[in-house]
Amino acid sequence: MATDGASCEPNFSRAPEDVGATAEAAVATKEFDVDTLSKSELRMLLSVMEGELEARDLVIEALRARRKEVFIQERYGRFNLNDPFLALQRDYEAGAGEKEKKPVCTNPLSILEAVMAHCRKMQERMSTQLAAAESRQKKLEMEKLQLQALEQEHKKLATRLEEERGKNKHVVLMLVKECKQLSGKVIEEAQKLEEVMTKLEEEKKKTNELEEELSAEKRRSTEMEAQLEKQLSEFDIEREQLRAKLNREEAHTTDLKEEIDKMKKMIEQLKRGNDSKPSLSLPRKTKDRRLVSISVGTEGPVTRSVACQTDLVIESTDHVKKLPLTVPVKPSTGSPLVSAPAKGNVCPSVPLLRPGIDRQASHGDLIVSSVPAVPPPNANRIEENGPSIGSTPDLASSTPPLPSNAAPPTGQTSGIASQNYSQASSMHSLHSPCANASLHPGPNPRIQAARFRFQGNANDQDQNGNTTQSPPSRDVSPTSRDNLVAKQLARNTVTQALSRFTSPQASASPRPGAPPTGDIGTHPAVSRTSLKTPGLARVDRGNPPPIPPKKPGLSQAPSPPHPQLKAIMDSSRASNAGAKVDNKTVASPPASLPQGNRVINEENLPKSSSPQLPPKPSIDLTVAPAGCAVSALATSQVGARPAETPGPTQPACSDSSLVIPTTIAFRSSINPVSASASRPGASDSLLVTASGWSPSLTPLLMSGGPAPLAGRPTLLQQAAAQGNVTLLSMLLNEEGLDINYSCEDGHSALYSAAKNGHTDCVRLLLNAKAQIDAADKNGFTPLCAAAAQGHFECVELLIAYHANIDHAADGGQTPLYLACKNGNKECIKVLLEAGTDRSVKTRDGWTPVHAAVDTGNVDSLKLLMYHRAPTLGHSLNEEEPEPGAFDLDQGQEGSEGTAKPVVPTDLINHANREGWTAAHIAASKGFKNCLEILCRHGGLEPERKDKCNRTVHDVATDDCKHLLENLNALKIPLRISVGETQPGSYGCDDFECENTICALNIHKQTSWDDFSKAVSQALTNHFQAISSDGWWSLEDMTFNNTPEPSIGLSARSILSITLGNVPWSAGQCFTQAPWDFMRKNKAEQVTVLLSGPQEGCLNSVTYASMIPLQMLQNYLRLVEQYHNVIFHGPEGSLQDYIAHQLALCMKHRQMAAGFSCEIVRAEVDAGFSKEQLIDLFINSACLIPVKQSPVTKKIIIILENLEKSSLSELLGDFLAPLENRSTESPCTFQKGNGTSECYYFHENCFLMGTIAKTCLQGSDLLVQQHFRWVQLRWDGEPMHGLLQRFLRRKVVNKFRGQAPSPCDPVCKMVDWALAVWHQLNSCLARLGTPDALLGPKYFLSCPVVPGHAQVTVKWMSKLWNAIIAPKVQEAILSRASVKRQPGLRQTTAKKPPSQGQQAVVKAALSILLNKAVLHGCPLLRAELDQYITDFKGGSFPLSIVSSYNSCSKKKGENGAWRKVSTNPRKKSGRFSSPTWSKPDLGEEGTKNKTMSQPNCNRIASLSKQKSSENDPSSMLNLDQRLSLGSDDEADLVKELQSMCSSKSESDISKIADSRDDLRRFDSSENSPAFSAAINNLRMPVSQKEVSPVSSHQTTKRSTSTSKTELSVSRVKSFLPVPRSKVSQCSQNTKRSSSSSNTRQTELNNNSKEEIWNLCKNEQVQKPNK
């Protein structure tokens, strides 16, 4: 800008045009605002102002020249040259310098020059400022461009972040879910691993035990075999001697007879006497030789075999001795070998020989002259008792039949004997097949029974397909043979059909009659199972059989490993040439080889050169393989299962281990029927009965005489052990069966059935008169086995059949002892009810109590200790329980109080062989529960020592030592009493007088010093526990070296202690010890009394209210120092209680000092007037007349509920006298009679007031500076932690001093109640409703009921309906109906709430209920849904619209915005606002986010862009809504806040109660020149739950010229708007748009700054113009 005339010339010439343009613009834009001008407009304004200044300079210069002439004329025109004074004056003015001139009067020109200088200076300053402003403007423009670029970049990044977050969200959820599943699987797998490892350890232990037992059994059997060999050799020697003697006697008798005949005929034959003498000796010698060779095979064994089939085993040795006496002397040499009766009788006894047991059989056992292959009687008898099922070959039936005209084949029989001998020697390692039952699934009992019957005479195909033939009937004619073939075909068909269910599929059978080739005896089935069987060297084979007599002259040594060599030697000795037999022996390998690796050794004996005889069909004996494995049918029964936990002894013989396949094949040259080695072939096994032919069930083979029952008892045992009721009943129906037969271990069928828990089998056997108390070799009876295995039903059945319940085994174990040892609770109960003796001791001195304690079974010990036997005369079912009967479900408390132990003292203190009692065992093993039960017995002697002089305490673990140390301790509850500080009506009724904090353990050796320390430590720990931040038990608190708790209480807070009713002080000592003192005085509790207001202390107040002691002392100091104190805070902040307790404390302090004191309470209500307050002050001597002397009495006045009246009206006149308490500042009050008098407040008067209000407003603020205010904020101490401390103390008291774990449901419910109070106040503060805030008082009544969490929820619903909901409703209505006027106090409309306000209230209640109350409830959702209906306002739908579609208003429509937020130079556009549930925002919607700045509504911009798009109204998608409990509910809370605090609520009245079908309209008016653009924008949803960003919609407000109209749009509320009222909403929007221009102008001119504070009341401030 120019400063001289030359430089101003161009500007001057340009000035008129600029001035004129400016004038026209000024006329048109009167309403220009400097703050809202753009850059071009500012330049225009500056040019206009510059022209004005230049024009003013020209005018000044012209006026200045004109004024100079006038001035000279005016000043010097009156002077005259004749006047010297004037000349002097003129000369003076002209001669002096300008600085030295002192004007005589005021010079207007100097003034004008000064003004011009000032203007010039201002002009220069203004030019400088304009230049600086222009540079700042440029800089600002650059910054704005950078800011816009950064905003766009930020929006792009935010959009990309939201998209990535949306993409990754489901991946994270899936990963979290998968992680949870994997963690659960890990836990399950760990548990399974632990179980498997436990089972593995048990199996290892069992395996080791079995190995030891097997090794012991092997040694025993070896010794027994040696002994039997010795006996056998002795028997052989004796037999040979007797046989030689017999031969001599027979020869002598024959000689004598011949001599007699000779002497009779001597007279007649005197001539021939000399000739006949040499011929008589020769036949005798020949006969002797023949008798020696064939004497064993006479008919004697046949008669004995029939007679001794049921004889006892003990008689076997006698039969051996008697055997030679039954041999006939004269065999029929010319007759056929087998007569007709003999032929018919050979078959029943043929399959009874078992070399699996007769391992030392020799040739003499089998050499038969008249009947082939008839076993000796002892062999027949052993077949009945032999336990080795499935391992015995039917060797007798393998003897080839001979033609009737053939001579006795001595060589062949000796070969058979050798074969039998070799087979027998290889069978000693075979196992019993019962364990094989676990390998094959058991068939149905009906199938077995059918096979049992159908195949009594049938042949079976073995597993390799080799067909065998059944024994013939007695009719051996060809016709009967044809019938036999047909019968065999039919039986084979049935067998094959049944085999599908019971055995593996048979392979193709080779040609019948062909000799077997290759390894016939291979049996891969067992080896494939790969089951490890410990101790393969021996098996349980039952009782060892008696050894048959050997052939004279044979070796007495044990059989060699390869006995077939002996067969070769014996066959070479044969003297008579007969039919040659091909002997094929397959010997088993040594038993020491592991299972699965056994090798089948096969050696073919050289065949004889004699031609083979053709097969004779008259006698076809089946060839049974020796030692073949038992198939599924042989060992499978219904109910077959592996052996259970080892009982008192080893398993029965029928429950032995796996079958080891050992194959011995025999091939006859007469009838070459090949026998498979893998075919099951034991005569007494089930498979023989089912698939072969059985003598006892074959009527076709009955040829006279009783059928032999060999193997039936063993089969009976197997059926009983496996629970096959069908087979067992069939066997029991057979005649002559010994049901009491016992195997080698002494296990009978009844024992096996009871051991395996087969109740039906036990009942069948008991009904069949089985011996109920038959004991095994270890003395265990069936009742012992059932009790040990836990089969209580079998125990009941055996007891019902009068079993001996007190039977003691060899080791002294009774059934009760075994049941206790195995922890079988039901069996123990049954035995005790049967009256068993609990005091029976074992050989080691153990009692059932020892056994129960040794296993750590608490239930078993409780039954032994407390279960009473029924009285005589009452049955078990008729017995009525006694009042003190023990119940296992009662737990410890039930057994302590009512039941008395029935175990005598001597039994509970009985010591075993080592001197250990049951308490020793329990303490040493750490069974604390068992030891505790034993300690409850009054007669327990814990000081009893064992043989090593150790007491129970010496061998106990740490836990048990602690229990023993507290054994005789008295548990006295320690309680804290607050005395007379019970507030009653002055405060909270939920305070408790006494609280149990712990239980003191007082021992006999406890001293009074120890007792004092224990009480002090317990109090300190308790104070620390209730003031800590978490749930800690007293055992977890280690506060010995820590400072005092946060509440300020310690052992020094104790006033007195009472032991029962006897007062006691810390450190005091009585003559008796504490233990004796407590017992003598029957002190049931120790009560600690805290010092309270009566003693001038606040300790009891602190404990009762949980307000820290230091803060209470501070409040008391404020009252005593300032005299005027007001306690204010939210309702329920214990203001009245605190004031009253402080008053009590002050009163007792003053009384202790010798002053009288009085407390005056006054409850203020709406009708309480100032006159009443004056009378109160005067009557209480607080106000005394000026004339009266001061009083010494202390007066404490408490004004309660001051919030119900106006403080300024009530206390306004008392402020100055209360602040200056002296006669110098009196106040005059008028009495009721009209007289007035001067009064003043004296120094001994204290005034306390309580206000249940968060903050003061209006005129009440004038009172604030005259009082000392104590604010009790809900979010600050002492109120903030008071509820937590109080509820924690309540829980500790409920649990009698033992704080539960944080996971306990009670702790969770208490934490929930605490969280509800915090969240509720936080939400109410966020809503801007401080009047609805609540103190902790209402939550102090939270119920603490263990196990009943629903009680707390019901209490919360009642609290919500009675207190919280009405306060919130009142506060929300107050906010919604506020008329906001600038500079004035808010006034509440008294009209009833409108429909929209009711909707606001319902929405607020629903949000608070779900966000603050129900959120975090530990109840399950299903349980919580049952109580939601009890809460008021819980039915309001929270599916509020969460997304809006942007739509411009139609032409001619206007809307008013409640909150204007504009950004300069933003073009209008249409944006589709996405749903809140989807994080990916559109690009345009993201670009137009509004900056949330406080003064954003003050920025305006001119828009010259026309709106080119009009969006129609659209329906809201009902699926795009807020879900229950989402984070976006806080957005609705903020929207409610902004709605309630806005100036215009034209649309609130249109809100329905609860409608989700909503429609929203946004409209803008279009004009020819300008149109307002509407951008529906929103802030991104915050991820923080505490303060989510609210969603706002912002627009740009444009200011147009005189040709345009101002168009302002309005933010719509997020509350539901019904569809039916869309027209009303639209019309109302039009009406409100008419005045929007004026209101908006006023807003822009008058509002300097508008801050949206959610916690304070908004006010509009006017700036000074």
UniProtKB/Swiss-Prot annotation:
In the record, which positions carry Asymmetric dimethylarginine? Answer: R500
User: Which residues form the ANK repeats?
Assistant: 711-741, 745-774, 778-807, 811-840, 844-873, 914-944
Which GO-annotated molecular functions does the record name?
Answer: protein phosphatase 2A binding
What is the protein name stated in its UniProt record? Cortactin-binding protein 2
Task: Describe the task this protein carries out.
Answer: Regulates the dendritic spine distribution of CTTN/cortactin in hippocampal neurons, and thus controls dendritic spinogenesis and dendritic spine maintenance. Associates with the striatin-interacting phosphatase and kinase (STRIPAK) core complex to regulate dendritic spine distribution of the STRIPAK complex in hippocampal neurons.
Keyword Coiled coil tagged: yes
What top-level branch of life does the organism fall under?
Eukaryota
Subunit structure, per the record? Interacts with CTTN/cortactin SH3 domain. Interacts with STRN, STRN4/zinedin and MOB4/phocein; this interactions mediate the association with the STRIPAK core complex and may regulate dendritic spine distribution of the STRIPAK complex in hippocampal neurons. Activation of glutamate receptors weakens the interaction with STRN and STRN4.
The segment annotated Disordered runs over 203-222, 368-480, 500-620, 875-902, 1447-1495, 1575-1665
Q: Where is the composition biased (Polar residues)?
A: 388-399, 410-429, 470-480, 1656-1665
Cellular component terms (Gene Ontology): actin cytoskeleton; cell cortex; dendritic spine; FAR/SIN/STRIPAK complex
**Has keyword Phosphoprotein?**
yes
Coiled coil where? 120-277
SUPFAM superfamilies attached here? Answer: Ankyrin repeat (SSF48403)
- Keywords, ordered alphabetically: ANK repeat, Cell projection, Coiled coil, Cytoplasm, Methylation, Phosphoprotein, Repeat, Synapse
UniProt modified residues of type Phosphoserine:
S1526
Bias type Low complexity, positions = 455-469, 1590-1604, 1623-1641
The cellular location(s) given in this protein's UniProt record come to: Cytoplasm, Cell cortex; Cell projection, Dendritic spine
What the entry lists under InterPro entries is as follows: Ankyrin_rpt, Ankyrin_rpt-contain_sf, Cortactin-Actin_Reg, Cortactin-binding_p2_N
